[in-house]
Structure formats: C-alpha cells, structure tokens
C-alpha cells in the first residue's frame, strides 16, 4: 500500500487540488490522472514548435531532441524528476498513440467509457444523454487533433531527393531481407510484448469449494443471505483514507507501543523456518492486542527481479522457494493469533518507478509484461504456497500486468488465483490501486481499499454507492456481489474473529489506537474533521514482557539474519577482553553516520530519509520505532576491559583519523523504499548498487590507513539489498565484512551478539551480490524513464532471476546466492536419494470441488431501499453504500464489458486444491545426508538442496509442413520444441545447529511440483522424462554432494 503519511495529508490534498490544467503555474505542465488528463490533453494539443516554447524551464540540452518535458508533481507539490516522452510528429504516430491509449480492456480512455458510471461529482451517474455527449466530444477532439496534424506544412525536399529515395529503398530492402532471414533461422519468443490486454478469464470463480473452509462458508452464507444490498456493498468498500482509526502493514504502522521487527529481507537471510514463524506469531499477537483484524503482510512481491527495486527489502529474497517458505511460515504465525494475513503484492510489482500515474505525471501505470511460464514458476510460486498456508487475503498490486491493471486483471485474479490456485479468501486492492468500477468487480477484486476512488480523501469511490447503483441497474450481477461479500465474511469466521475476546481496554472490539495522532483524544474521522472527537488512543502495550517480550525474537532474527561475507585470519569474533597487539589498551575507531542514532529512528515520516543507523527501509512497510539500539550505543558496553575508543559519526574522515587505531569499525549503508517518498535523490528505487552517502570512499579511506596499515578493519553494512563492493572488498586492510541487512529495533544488540561470537554467524545471502549492476542482466534493470506513453517493462528472461542468470551466462559473482561464512566449519556427506513414488508426466485429472459454493436469491430489491435513510447526516467525504437519488438504477443494457466477458473458461487442470492440484504437493523423493561440525565452536549450517532438470527436454509444438517426395503430397507433423531450464534451482533447505564434533542426519523431500515445469501448451505442470540431478551444499555454487533421480 502507498498512502501518504498523515502528517503531510494537508500538503497532499493541496497537491490534488492544484493537479489540474486550469490551475497550473506558468511554464509548469502538470498532469492529472488519466480520466482527467487525456481529454484535456487532446483538446489542447499543440505542435512540437508550440511545445518547445511551452516550458520555460526545459533543459537546453533537449531543445532539439524531439521531446517535451513532463514534470510530475509529487505528494509534497515539488518537482523531483522529469520524464521525456517523444513528440508524435505524424498522423500514423498519432493513430498508434491513440490506439495504445484505447486498449487494455477499455482502461486507458476510461473517462469516456469506464468512469461514466463511477466518477460523479454529486453521487449522481451520467445519464445516457450525457454519456453520448461525452463520447461525441471526445471523438470530435480526436478528429480535430488529427486534422491539425494533417494541416502541418509539407516538408520541402532537397534537390538530391532521388539520392535520398534510393538510399531509403536500399536500406529498407536490407532490413526486410535481414528480418526475414532472422525469422526463418531463429524461431523464438518475441523479445518485446505487443501492447495488448492480458488474456481474459470469466466469470469470477465462487469461493467455498474446499473442505477446510466449508464450515466458515456455511456461517457466512447464513449471515449474508439476511443482508440488504447496501449492507453487502458496505462490506466490500473501505470508508476512505483517514476515515477510520488505523492502517497497518508489516507490523502496525502509525501505532504506539508496538515492535519494529527486522525487515523481511533480514528474516529471509536467517534461512530459519522456525524464526520466520516466530516473528509472524509476534506480529499477529501485537495486531490482536491492538484490535486489528487484518495485517497487511507479508510481502512476497516484489520478488527482487531488479536488485535496485525500492521495496525488495519488504520481501524475503530473490528466489521463489525461499520467498515462498518465509511467506508461508509468516502467514501461519500471524494467523495463529486469529488475525488475517495478507499475501501481497499480486503480482509483478518489481519496481517503484511508474507504479502509480499520479506519482510520476504519466497517463497510467507501467505494465509489467511476463510470459506464462515465468509467471507460474517464479512470481506466482510464493502466492501458491501462501494459499497452501491458508492465507485469508491477497492484495493486488498497483501496476498493470500484460497491459491490464493488476486489480482488474481477470486472468490473474479469476483464472490463476481463484481457479487454479483455489484461493478461498478475498482479494483487496492496494491503497488506490483500483482503477475502474465494473471491470474490477468482474475481474476478481473483492474489496476496495481504502475506499477512495482515483484520489486521496475526495469522498468519491469507484464502488460504494456506485456499486449499489451498478447492481441495481444490472451492470454488475448480484451473484458476483454475493460472492465478494461471502468471501470476506467467510474469512472473518475462518480466523475465529466472531468469537474474539475484545482487546483491552474493554470496548467495541475495534482498534484501541489512532494512526493519525499520538494524543489520547482526537478525531474519529481525521479525513473529514467533522467534529467527532473522542478518546482514540488507549496506549495498550502490545510488545510483550519478560520471556514473552517480542524484543527477544526481534533480536534473534536480526542476529541470525546477519551474513558474514569475509573473515580474514578469523578476525571475527572479537574478544571482549582484547588488548592492543603491543600489549597496551586496545584503540578502537568507530566510523560512519550509520553507527549513530543521529536524530532518532522516527525523525522522518515513514522513515523517509537516510540519517543515522539504517534499521529499515522507507514507506508503508515501516512502523514507529519504540526504540532503536544503535551500534554506537551497544559498543559502549561491549568490552569487559578498558579500551580507548573514538567515534567519527560522519562519512567524511581524514586518513589521520585512522592511523593510530588497532581496530577500525566502519558502518555504511544503502537505503530505498516506496515510490511516494523521495530521499537523497532516490525516488523509491535505488539509482545504483553502490553504498550511499560516500560510503565507498569512507571504507577505502579507513581500510587503507587503519593503524598505519597494520590495523584491522571490520565493515558493517546495513542495506536494503545487494551492494557492489568491488572498489574495496579485496583491499588488504579489509579483514571482515558483516552484512546486517535491516535489523529493526534491536540493531546494536544483535550486532554485538554476532560481532563478539555470542551466536554463530549463520546468516546466508537471500540474493546474489554481483560485481556490477550489469552482471544481473538487461532484464534486471529498473525502467527509470518512460519508454512509451504507457511504460512497458518486459520481463523477457524472468525465468532466470538472480543466481539463475549468473549461472546461465557463467558470470562469477562476488558472493553467490545462499553464501555465508560461519565461525566454525561443517562437512556434508553420505548423500542418499530414495524415490517415494513412481514418476508420471502429469498430475491426475483435476478433482471435483469438495463442496458446493453457497447459493443465494438473486432477485433485486426495490431501489428506494438503497437511499440514504431519512434524516441521516452523512459525514463529509466518508464513503457510504447509500444512494442520494435513484438516477441510473433502472436496468440497462450495459455494453462496456471487458473483452472475453461472455466467454466462459474451463477450469484449469492444474487446480483443484489449495495452492493448486493436490497431487502437485505429494512427496516424490526423499533426500538424506549427514552433516558434521568439524570446527571448535557450536554453529548453525544451512543445508541447501538444488535441482537440475534433465537435458534435451522437448514437447510438442506447432504443426509444420515436412519435406516429402516429389510425387507425394506434403504432410504436416508437430515440431518438437526444446524446453530450456535454469542450470539449477533451489527446491528445499533446512537449518541445523550442531555442537563441535556432532554429526546428525538431515532429511528433505521433493514434491511433484518441485520436479515439474509449467507447460504453456498444456497449461499444466509437467514432470519431464530423464534423470534429474540433485545437488546439496552450502550455497548455489558450493554444492559438494550430487546424486541422480
């Protein structure tokens, strides 16, 4: 989710008011969201020469570039970045542009088609005459735009026109010949996706088909069948931003007396399933004590395809299996408290740039374009495991997927999530990710959050009263609304929230805190300021006490999530009784802004700045820190003997500051976050993978001068993701490197645990650290500038994410995926592989639904029953399901349904259970080995299991004509298509703790799905014939054991 911080709500509302052509300041072209921007842009279209004069602040370097400058307005009303869009100079270009903005299920010209039902000023729909008028005006504007282009003066050709013409003809012939030759000899998937909508999948499958949800759906059916129309609509639509008391994410955002746990990326670095679940338990417990029903996490999208992606740190790592295991364990932990977890963001939310149009001044969000196989094998894999973990809610993402908005993408929500993966809970939108009314209902969205439509806090919802109207006039089938409501209510019953004990203090069971004020008394509806004042904060401490204190699990996760990357001559662990090599007092230097508390952890809203020690990224995935133990504070009491320490809590130091030190501790970081915040020149996504704030220079300066070249330098990195460290990692002065990721409130304490060896260095990398950003491949680069009116991010090689790409192209990383040193040593031996079932190509036929979904009366009520009750006084900007009048409630022949709406799809053969066909999760192989601690310390080893698929796998392709004798007619046969696989893929892992000389057996299993690939032709998981190679080791490139199956 990405709402603006409450402390800046006024500024953001001011921006919304001014984000309009009629109120732009001279020389600053402002762009409103699509449904406003397109008609106005068309009506005021100017030639390129006019554009050249339009922006008095344009960069002179671009005066003749054929581009004009868009200046996006951010939430604070300031200009942080510019996007250059090519000017359309010919009629064909205009036609192409207009075609592009009218595709994608009628999304991009939604002002004339989609929002006629859902974008009103006074809760009134446009009647049919107004609709016709709007469409007529729009078409007229388009005609006038083309006419102006055709009226441009013709180009005066030079006298050498014939030479130019000849050159053009020759060039075209060469290009055509080359293209045809390439097409014949190189039959592959196209390297760009055409800008066409995603496949359609209708109707939206009904919930209540799985046995373990049966009781919950029965209870829900009993309740829903007695609800009125407006009561049903009320459940599906949020009440509006800041209209309630709370908003929550990873932890409890904007709440008092809650814990700031280590980030997801730190949790993934533990590779410890038990800790993953314990962290989830603690998070769910705090939500329960604060009266929160739904926790908006965990995040498993972004997956980390782009190492510079701004929100990667909220997830658990750049591998679908690691991400899936951590997400599933977190969900089980959260929901063990009766709190609903939310699997987000479904799906392909891999970058922050252009995720929302109003954040970047573009017509609509970018499209993440991905193939069916990569979608299943990489990006949807964690969501499938989350559904197997019984997650109650899934959040759809901001951007488009294959040019259809994720929150109305019927293929994703209906076809994959609800049918194939058997999701029984409800789909909620990310905050303001809903971009249409009817299409989102039919496309599979069940709950609109926070209820606002296209703008924050404007009181206009795409659903609310407009959904009531759409059901009454039959634009939306009432049975679809019934399923939406039933899914939500069934999830409430499924988590036992109907029997919740009311959280302290005794009250109505709702939130006992306000996200919008720290005062005891405050507004009940902050977004309205309607005068409703009450006690809103009861200051309930949810952090636990004594042995149940959540700080304990936070510290454990932070410590086990710390990765030891380098350790020359056992520099670490440090001794608490250390002395100088000369026998005197140890002289310690502490360097870097990242070591200190600076202005405190909550100095910037939503942690939207990089100051002091970095303990979390920024954005809606953060919390208000109850405290933060910085490294410098923890170091003050770290030694048991007297030492001489000097702190330089800045990143600019002189060589002389290090020459007299025996030990130099350098603290550096790299930060990023959600796209609605820009900090330090970073607009959500990182600009590169280097350390920030001069960190690389700081490391080189200290490491080259510590002790005059005789001292030892230890580097501690706090980072949101991979950091390129080539400029200093091999310096002889760099003796040890610790990657502490984002450790949360117990940062300093957890670091001391590892630094001084109280716990083993047992973290392992959840991603690959390359030697440059380019090492990750062209498909892993953030799209920083729009490449089309609707930015297109093509995930052409998404099957080869992270270490898979390095393996594919034999690129040597600095530190591979899964890498991490320990303070002891381990040996893996005695691998044995045992089949548990016979191989078979495909799962058996899809099982029938275990339970029939609820059935309701679909008759419509009297429209008058949906009017505001007599004498009712609405709260300003609060979202209601009631109608203010009966306009547009008569049944109508609605004709703007998305493409494919009238085509019923067949159930997926890969479905039939939670997470997919039950047979996919049957164990096929047992893998056993012995693990021995061969060192002199207790330690933990992460045993990682990888699979290589058989070579030369093929499947039937298209029909092709085969050569035949001259006297015979031609014949056709299916060609065989070669199926490519990554060199190896992670499929299982476990973490084991051993005493010195201890030896223990480890057993892991592989499921059918682990040994299958997604066949785009068969639309099912297929286990290929041939021998699989099964690798076991310590990282993706340290795999001493291999066997075959």
UniProtKB/Swiss-Prot annotation:
One example of a Gene Ontology biological process annotation: cellulose catabolic process
Principal location class: membrane
GO cellular component terms attached to this protein's record: plasma membrane
Catalytic activity annotation: Hydrolysis of terminal, non-reducing beta-D-glucosyl residues with release of beta-D-glucose
Pathway: Glycan metabolism; cellulose degradation
Residues carrying sugar: 226, 234, 402, 473, 512, 577, 893, 902, 988
InterPro entries noted in UniProt: Cellulose_deg_GH3, Fn3-like, Glyco_hydro_3_C, Glyco_hydro_3_C_sf, Glyco_hydro_3_N, Glyco_hydro_3_N_sf, Glycoside_hydrolase_SF, Ig-like_fold
Localization annotation: Cell membrane
Extracellular side: 185-1045
Stretches of the chain forming a coiled coil according to its record: none
Annotated TM spans: 164-184
Bias (Basic and acidic residues): 11-20
Record membrane topology: Single-pass type II membrane protein
Domain of life: Eukaryota
Signal peptide: none
Function (record text): Beta-glucosidases are one of a number of cellulolytic enzymes involved in the degradation of cellulosic biomass. Catalyzes the last step releasing glucose from the inhibitory cellobiose.
Name listed for the protein in its UniProt record: Probable beta-glucosidase E
Protein species of origin: Neosartorya fischeri (strain ATCC 1020 / DSM 3700 / CBS 544.65 / FGSC A1164 / JCM 1740 / NRRL 181 / WB 181) (Aspergillus fischerianus)
Organism phylogeny: Eukaryota, Fungi, Dikarya, Ascomycota, Pezizomycotina
């Amino acid at each position: 989710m990405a709402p603006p911080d409450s402390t800046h709500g006024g500024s953001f509302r001011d921006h919304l008011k001014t984000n309009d052509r009629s109120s732009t300041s001279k020389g600053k072209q402002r762009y409103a969201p699509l449904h406003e921007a397109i008609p106005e842009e068309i009506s005021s279209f100017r030639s390129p020469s006019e554009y050249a004069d339009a922006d008095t602040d344009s960069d002179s370097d671009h005066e003749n570039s054929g581009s004009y400058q868009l200046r996006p307005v951010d939430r604070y009303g300031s200009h942080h970045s510019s996007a250059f869009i090519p000017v359309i100079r010919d009629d064909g270009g205009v036609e192409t542009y207009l075609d592009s903005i009218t595709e994608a299920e009628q999304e991009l010209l939604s002002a004339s088609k989609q929002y006629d039902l859902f974008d009103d000023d006074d809760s009134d729909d446009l009647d049919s005459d107004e609709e016709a008028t709007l469409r007529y005006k729009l078409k007229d504007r388009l005609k006038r735009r083309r006419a102006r282009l055709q009226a441009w003066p013709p180009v005066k050709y030079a006298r050498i026109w014939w030479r130019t013409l000849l050159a053009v003809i020759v060039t075209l012939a060469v290009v055509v010949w080359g293209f045809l030759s390439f097409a014949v000899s190189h039959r592959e998937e196209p390297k760009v996706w055409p800008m066409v909508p995603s496949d359609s999948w209708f109707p939206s499958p009904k919930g209540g088909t799985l046995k373990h949800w049966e009781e919950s759906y029965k209870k829900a059916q009993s309740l829903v069948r007695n609800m009125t129309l407006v009561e049903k609509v009320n459940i599906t639509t949020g009440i509006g931003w800041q209209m309630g008391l709370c908003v929550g994410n990873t932890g409890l955002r904007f709440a008092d007396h809650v814990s700031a746990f280590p980030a997801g990326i730190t949790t993934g670095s533990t590779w410890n399933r038990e800790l993953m679940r314990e962290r989830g338990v603690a998070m769910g417990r705090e939500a329960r004590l604060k009266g929160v029903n739904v926790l908006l996490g965990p995040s498993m999208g972004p997956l980390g395809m782009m190492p510079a992606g701004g929100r990667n740190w909220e997830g658990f790592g750049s591998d679908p299996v690691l991400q899936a295991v951590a997400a599933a364990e977190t969900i089980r932990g959260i929901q063990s408290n009766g709190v609903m977890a939310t699997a987000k963001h479904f799906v392909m939310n891999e970058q922050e740039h252009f995720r929302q149009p109003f954040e970047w001044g573009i017509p609509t969000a970018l499209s993440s374009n991905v193939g069916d196989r990569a979608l299943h094998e990489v990006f949807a894999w964690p969501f499938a495991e989350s559904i197997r973990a019984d997650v109650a809610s899934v959040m759809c993402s901001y951007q488009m997927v294959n040019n259809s908005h994720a929150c109305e993408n019927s293929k994703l929500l209906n076809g994959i999530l609800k049918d194939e993966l058997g999701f029984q809970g409800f789909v909620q939108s990310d905050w303001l990710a809903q971009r249409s009314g009817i299409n989102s209902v039919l496309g599979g969205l069940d709950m609109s959050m926070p209820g606002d439509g296209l703008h924050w806090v404007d009181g206009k919802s795409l659903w609310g009263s407009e959904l009531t109207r759409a059901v009454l006039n039959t634009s939306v089938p009432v049975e679809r609304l019934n399923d939406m409501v039933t899914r939500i209510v069934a999830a409430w019953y499924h988590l036992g929230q109907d029997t919740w004990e009311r959280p302290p203090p005794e009250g109505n069971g709702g939130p006992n805190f306000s996200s919008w004020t720290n005062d005891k008394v405050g507004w009940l509806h902050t977004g309205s300021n309607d005068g409703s004042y009450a006690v809103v904060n009861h200051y309930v401490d949810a952090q636990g006490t004594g042995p149940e204190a959540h700080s304990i699990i936070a510290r454990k996760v932070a410590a086990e999530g710390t990765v030891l990357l380098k350790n020359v001559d056992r520099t670490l662990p440090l001794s608490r009784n250390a002395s100088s090599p000369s026998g005197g007092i140890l002289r310690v230097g502490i360097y870097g802004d990242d070591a200190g508390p600076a202005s405190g952890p909550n100095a910037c809203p939503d942690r939207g700045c990089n100051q002091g020690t970095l303990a979390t990224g920024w954005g809606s995935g953060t919390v208000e820190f109850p405290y933060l133990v910085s490294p410098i504070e923890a170091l003050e009491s770290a030694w048991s003997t007297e030492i001489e320490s000097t702190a330089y809590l800045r990143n600019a130091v002189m060589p002389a500051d290090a020459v007299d030190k025996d030990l130099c501790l350098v603290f550096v970081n790299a930060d990023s976050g959600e796209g609605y915040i820009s900090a330090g020149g970073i607009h959500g996504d990182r600009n590169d993978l280097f350390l920030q704030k001069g960190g690389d220079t700081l490391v080189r300066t200290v490491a080259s001068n510590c002790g005059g070249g005789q001292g030892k330098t230890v580097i501690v990195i706090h980072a949101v993701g991979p950091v390129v460290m080539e400029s200093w990692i091999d310096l002889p002065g760099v003796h040890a490197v610790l990657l502490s990721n984002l450790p949360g409130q117990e940062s300093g304490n957890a670091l001391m645990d590892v630094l001084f060896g109280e716990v083993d260095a047992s973290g392992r990398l959840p991603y690959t650290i390359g030697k440059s950003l380019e090492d990750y491949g062209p498909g892993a680069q953030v799209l920083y500038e729009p490449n089309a009116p609707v930015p297109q991010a093509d995930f052409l090689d998404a099957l080869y994410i992270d270490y898979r790409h390095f393996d594919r192209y034999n690129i040597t990383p600095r530190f591979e995926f899964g890498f991490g040193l320990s303070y002891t040593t381990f040996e893996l031996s005695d691998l044995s592989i045992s089949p548990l079932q016979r191989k078979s190509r495909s799962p058996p036929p899809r099982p029938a639904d275990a339970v029939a979904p609820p059935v309701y009366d679909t008759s419509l009520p009297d429209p008058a029953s949906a009017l505001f009750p007599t004498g009712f006084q609405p709260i300003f900007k609060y979202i209601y399901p009631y109608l203010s009048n009966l306009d547009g409630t008569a049944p109508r022949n609605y004709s703007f349904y998305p493409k494919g709406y009238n085509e019923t799809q067949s159930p997926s053969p890969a479905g039939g259970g939670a997470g997919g066909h039950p047979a996919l999760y049957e164990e096929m192989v047992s893998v056993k080995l012995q693990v021995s601690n061969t060192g002199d310390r207790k330690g933990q080893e992460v045993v990682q299991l990888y699979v290589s698929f058989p070579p030369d796998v093929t499947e039937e392709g298209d029909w092709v004509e085969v050569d035949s004798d001259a006297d015979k007619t031609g014949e056709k046969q299916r060609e065989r298509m070669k199926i490519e696989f990554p060199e190896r893929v992670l499929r299982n892992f476990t973490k084991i703790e051993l005493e010195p000389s201890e030896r223990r057996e480890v057993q892991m299993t592989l499921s059918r799905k682990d040994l299958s690939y997604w066949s785009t032709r068969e639309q099912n998981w297929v286990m290929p014939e041939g021998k699989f190679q099964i690798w076991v080791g310590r990282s993706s490139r340290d795999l001493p054991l291999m066997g075959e199956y």
